[in-house]
């Protein structure tokens, strides 16, 4: 199972299953995790990227440990709605991951997630050095929270 639409994910998730959020960058992968009720997203660790096989190994170990039912991955669409090279790289990453796992992926528009994460960290008076360490997982948390809010809205209409 490679990718699902958010509506398909809402129908396939069982109560008590957690969802992970990913902010895929060229140097890092920010991770976030939902609670079992899928109401809140919490930033987790940041994976320093090396090569795909190692990145996949670390990500799948995280998924096994946290019992991840699905991944919500930020899709870096341009502000004008067009797709650039980062969108292509994200889709290629998901295609490659689909060969290694049955855990489904959901693409989520990540426009302004890093801006929102940076603003939140600034408001919490996090130092510049700490912001650099935490920005990717904070962005993953914003991406995941957007998807969780949508899932919650879909659940109320089912």
UniProtKB/Swiss-Prot annotation:
GO process terms (BP): rRNA 5'-end processing
Keyword entries, A-Z: Cytoplasm, Hydrolase, Nuclease, Ribosome biogenesis
Cited InterPro entries: RNaseH-like_sf, YqgF, YqgF/RNaseH-like_dom, YqgF/RNaseH-like_dom_sf
EC number per UniProt: 3.1.-.-
Subcellular location, record wording: Cytoplasm
CDD domains on file: YqgF
Gene Ontology CC entries for this record: cytosol
Enzyme class, broadest EC rank: hydrolase
Any GO molecular function: nuclease activity
SUPFAM superfamilies reported in the protein's UniProt record: Ribonuclease H-like (SSF53098)
Pfam families: RuvX
Family: Belongs to the YqgF nuclease family.
Function description: Could be a nuclease involved in processing of the 5'-end of pre-16S rRNA.
Alphabetical list of PANTHER family matching this protein: POLYNUCLEOTIDYL TRANSFERASE, RIBONUCLEASE H-LIKE SUPERFAMILY PROTEIN
UniProt protein name: Putative pre-16S rRNA nuclease
């Amino acid at each position: 199972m490679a990718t699902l639409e958010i509506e398909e994910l809402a129908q396939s998730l069982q109560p008590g299953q957690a969802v992970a959020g990913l902010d895929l960058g060229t140097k890092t992968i920010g991770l976030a995790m939902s609670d079992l009720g899928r109401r809140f997203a919490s930033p987790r660790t940041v994976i320093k990227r090396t090569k795909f096989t190692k990145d996949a190994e670390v990500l799948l170990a995280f998924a096994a440990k946290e019992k991840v039912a699905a991944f919500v991955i930020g899709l870096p669409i341009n502000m004008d709605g067009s797709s650039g090279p980062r969108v292509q790289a994200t889709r290629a990453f998901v295609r490659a991951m689909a060969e290694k796992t049955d855990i489904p992926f959901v693409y989520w528009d990540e426009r302004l997630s890093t801006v929102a994460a940076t603003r939140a960290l600034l408001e919490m008076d996090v130092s510049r050095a700490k912001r650099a360490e935490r920005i990717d997982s904070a962005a993953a948390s914003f991406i995941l929270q957007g998807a969780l809010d949508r899932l919650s809205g879909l659940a109320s209409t089912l």
